[in-house]
């Protein structure tokens, strides 16, 4: 009933379990992922969690820059007027613990994810051109206990804008922003109509889920796209993220019928 996911991962051989929650803030351009790491072996664990970023800023891998930012203790990807700030915190404090910046798909360069295979990133401070990055968090998990981290990616038009979002996240707290987003989407899907009260619960759940999925295909400016589908780029070199007047009108009409006029 909300656009906050829950994903559970288990590795029996390592004796670890992860619970992840993903959300995009409903007000600000920030993506969050929380990760809880549980020990299932009854002993102290030293765990490294890595996030890899293959960003082609403004849809081109040419002329990108990425650098470690001492002010925020995060990593910044940018080109022209498009900026992404990658950051997080674990139980020990704010900021990333490790990072790697480097070339991707240039000669023999496969990408910085290779640097994570030994559990230690090289901390190169800056890279330019066709680049990618990896950030890492060091976690100490007690026996039969858990460790926590939250990761975020903020988007903006200037460095000041993304750094300001980072400050806002620290002031408000990531979990508070995620909880607020979860509550907002629950309210969006909570449509109180007599005809909905009479249908089976599984059908009503499908209705709410469908309403939320439809909302993910609509821009805050009002554009209703046909399908936010990217996999056809590999086959046809195109997406289906077009705003068709007919399709948009049908969706807007359906939203009007359930009282979501602000979106339609």
Segments from the language model and where they lie:
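Extended polysaccharide-engagement surfaces of secreted carbohydrate-active enzymes
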Residues: 1
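Acidic/polar, glycine-enriched structural segments that form the non-catalytic walls/loops
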Residues: 12-19, 23-32, 36-239, 261-263
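Well-ordered alpha-helical segments within folded domains of soluble proteins
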Residues: 209, 242-257, 261-264
